Amino acid sequence: MSTEFEKKMEEHIDSCSLEQLRDILVNKNGDAKLTNRFRALFNLKCVAEEFAQRPEEAQRAVEYICEAFADSSELLKHEVAYVLGQTGNLACAATLREVMLDHAQQCMVRHEASEALGALGDAASLGALERSRREDPSEEVRQTSELAIERIRWQASGAAATEQLQQSLYSSVDPAPPLSLEKDYDVPQLQALLNDQRAPLFERYRAMFRLRDIGSDEACYALASGFDDPSALFKHEIAYVFGQIGNPCVVPHLQEVLKREHEAPMVRHEAAEALGSIATDDVLPVLKRHLQDKDEVVRESAAIALDMYDYENSNELEYAPA
């Protein structure tokens, strides 16, 4: 999800207790809109990440968020895993390991659980991540676990403290840090590394996030060249960063990816969410067409993107969860 999308989802709901937010998230009454369940999830996230200041409430928030892993929605569960990784709260690590190694969970959910463990920097999860990297039947999950292992090792090596990194405009904890500023790459050099199939995946991701932080039209077009990559994981991450950047110049590229019927659902869903985040008028008919998409995660992503577009363009003061 894009940072701007998250900020809207995190707008505080004063009238809801943690228990009420949990009930909306898990759809206790059976009639909660998916968008409102997301809103409840991100409100619980805001509490879960305050584990230093409010440890008991943060623990409850983590437990309530984890209850949603019993849901049937692949989109919701993948967002649950993402949110847990972003909290920095290690209380969720054991549950994330279980979800990652549970092959009954959908691919996108296992992938996001693996990525979340990397975001947490949880060295205690390295063994489980190695197992996932070796044994998971999905290439996307195996690649995610490879990245998570490399990120944890990078963080533990001290490089995180010594490398000169650009101050990010984005609050997300990413699967890899951007390339260090100590080497003065230009955009064509970064594009070459981004698309170098012989380079380690972690380094290619670092090039990706350096291009994201540049954020110019030239950098966006360089990133768009990655949509020809054979890896669904790689392409979905490019769509994600386009949602963060919010540059309308990428709309045609995202539309083209979303229309690819052969493309992996994880890529197409991320393209739909990115289009919703950019929210120019020309994306509306595209998203509406995909409300009837063959892939459930794409249908749900289009619905959420349209709900958020309506909210952005209405006079509503509060995006009510109930």
From Swiss-Prot:
Q: Which cofactor does it need?
A: Fe(2+)
Q: Tell me the protein family, please.
A: Belongs to the deoxyhypusine hydroxylase family.
- UniProt entry tagged with the keyword Nucleus: yes
Protein's job: Catalyzes the hydroxylation of the N(6)-(4-aminobutyl)-L-lysine intermediate to form hypusine, an essential post-translational modification only found in mature eIF-5A factor.
Q: Where in the cell is it found?
A: Cytoplasm; Nucleus
Pathway the protein contributes to: Protein modification; eIF5A hypusination
Q: Report the Pfam families cross-referenced here.
A: HEAT_2
* Ligand binding (Fe cation 1): H78, E79, H111, E112
Question: Cofactor: bound how, per the entry note?
Answer: Binds 2 Fe(2+) ions per subunit.
Q: EC number(s) per UniProt?
A: 1.14.99.29
| Protein name in the entry | Deoxyhypusine hydroxylase
What does the entry list as the binding residues for Fe cation 2?
Answer: H236, E237, H269, E270
Q: Name one GO cellular component term.
A: nucleus
Q: Which organism is it from?
A: Eremothecium gossypii (strain ATCC 10895 / CBS 109.51 / FGSC 9923 / NRRL Y-1056)
Quote the InterPro entries the UniProt record gives.
ARM-like, ARM-type_fold, Deoxyhypusine_hydroxylase, PBS_lyase_HEAT
User: Which keywords annotate this record?
Assistant: Cytoplasm, Hypusine biosynthesis, Iron, Metal-binding, Monooxygenase, Nucleus, Oxidoreductase, Repeat
Q: Which SUPFAM superfamilies match?
A: ARM repeat
Q: Do you know which HAMAP family this protein is assigned to?
A: Deoxyhypusine_hydroxylase
Q: Where are the HEAT-like PBS-type repeats?
A: 76-102, 109-135, 234-260, 267-293
The record's GO molecular-function terms, alphabetically, read:
deoxyhypusine monooxygenase activity; metal ion binding
Q: Which catalysed reactions does the entry list for this protein?
A: [eIF5A protein]-deoxyhypusine + AH2 + O2 = [eIF5A protein]-hypusine + A + H2O
GO process terms (BP)? microtubule cytoskeleton organization
